């Protein structure tokens, strides 16, 4: 993104220090370190305010407190800002997820996503097959007034949330 939008600045956040170190190294190698910085921070503590765009990729369903994270995102966005949310594609019912991708995601979720969430504070445990309705409910409970699916692949749904 820093290469595609050279007039913008970017801050990447992750709670895993090794990932942050690697991201900073790659930004330097790509020649964008002057406009891309990285910090060790969780979804409820990343820095900044007035963001035009906040992104989250395949992580909301793994969080122990996705509502707390959504509230923090909301508090850091500009009044006309956008939260871009990428999550595993899922229907809202078990029956709608009984397909090859859904079955694989249920398996991953059983061994990774759900235990990860349960090990954290709150432990909501949305899991990889949360579905659009559950994501919508979290986002709107956090104070967002607009939520819509703006894209999808065979594996992911892409949502836009706005204040």
Which residue ranges define each predicted feature?
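Conserved SAM-binding motif I beta-strand of class I
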Residues: 9-14
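A short acidic, Gly/Pro-enriched loop at the edge of an enzyme's catalytic core
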Residues: 41-54
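A short glycine-rich, Lys/Arg-flanked "PGG" loop and its adjoining helix->strand segment in the class I
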Residues: 67-79
